[in-house]
Amino acid sequence: MPVKKKRKSGVAAAAAEDGGLKKCKISSYCRSQPPARLISGEEHFSSKKCLAWFYEYAGPDEVVGPEGMEKFCEDIGVEPENIIMLVLAWKLEAESMGFFTKEEWLKGMTSLQCDCTEKLQNKFDFLRSQLNDISSFKNIYRYAFDFARDKDQRSLDIDTAKSMLALLLGRTWPLFSVFYQYLEQSKYRVMNKDQWYNVLEFSRTVHADLSNYDEDGAWPVLLDEFVEWHKVRQAS
């Protein structure tokens, strides 16, 4: 989860600066770290301990903001852009990228039964496993739209959309790099929720060679234009 300053996606900023997918450094791996300390079954979850853990990162407004989030990521050994942070935010039902409120933290960490760094590190495999479950991944993908958008906007700006799509689909969708290139040169400056939802459906149902693409289907114009653009490129 990118650390968001002035409500701007850090991943999106990186993509805009680097100018393309090849240089958009989005990680699904943890930085090198010592193994998490084994937690014995006798160490039960403590709400008091969880709250004290929250205050290690929260500011005077009782919110973990950009600076606290950077320290939190450093302590747990995960880059802010790591997809684990997106899954964690989903589990905490966090509303805004780069911020955890006290209520979100306590509710989410209670659900995960985590009241310290080591317990959360021991949950990393579980958090990753949510990405392999079709239903959970769909929920995470849909959650990412509202999580990443500026709250005064109904759509995602296209740079943020490209970065979040790279995070979520970049390693699994064979056509992703082509779709990314299409978005790079397209007229689109935002992506709305319907388009966002349909990109996932398209990636799951349409073959990489587009052989089963239905021109009369109810796809958004954005995807119709992508298919047309891709076919023209292939023909030339």
From Swiss-Prot:
Gene symbol of the encoding locus: DCUN1D5
UniProt xrefs under Pfam families: Cullin_binding
An annotated GO BP: positive regulation of protein neddylation
Keyword Phosphoprotein among UniProt keywords: yes
Coiled-coil spans in chain: none
Its biological purpose: Contributes to the neddylation of all cullins by transferring NEDD8 from N-terminally acetylated NEDD8-conjugating E2s enzyme to different cullin C-terminal domain-RBX complexes which is necessary for the activation of cullin-RING E3 ubiquitin ligases (CRLs). May play a role in DNA damage response and may participate in cell proliferation and anchorage-independent cell growth.
Key words, A-Z: Cytoplasm, Cytoskeleton, Nucleus, Phosphoprotein
DCUN1 domain residues: 45-231
InterPro entries from the UniProt entry: DCN-prot (IPR014764), DCN1-like_PONY (IPR042460), PONY_dom (IPR005176)
GO molecular function, one term: ubiquitin conjugating enzyme binding
Domain note: The DCUN1 domain, also known as PONY domain, mediates the interaction with different cullins. The DCUN1 domain mediates the interaction with the N-terminally acetylated NEDD8-conjugating E2s enzyme leading to the NEDD8 transfer from N-terminally acetylated NEDD8-conjugating E2s enzyme to different cullin C-terminal domain-RBX complexes; the neddylation efficiency correlates with the DCUN1D5-cullin and DCUN1D5-E2 interaction affinities.
The protein, known as: DCN1-like protein 5
Modified residues (Phosphoserine): 9, 40, 47
PTMs per UniProt: Phosphorylation at Ser-40 is independent of cullin's interaction. Phosphorylated in response to both TICAM1 and MYD88 dependent Toll-like receptor (TLR) pathway activation. Phosphorylated in response to IL1B stimulation.
A Gene Ontology cellular-component term: ubiquitin ligase complex
Major localization class: nucleus
Subunit-structure text: Part of a complex that contains DCUN1D5, CUL1 and RBX1; this interaction is bridged by CUL1. Interacts (via the DCUN1 domain) with the unneddylated cullins: interacts with CUL1, CUL2, CUL3, CUL4A, CUL4B and CUL5; these interactions promote the cullin neddylation and the identity of the cullin dictates the affinity of the interaction. Interacts (via DCUN1 domain) with UBE2M (N-terminally acetylated form) and probably with UBE2F (N-terminally acetylated form).
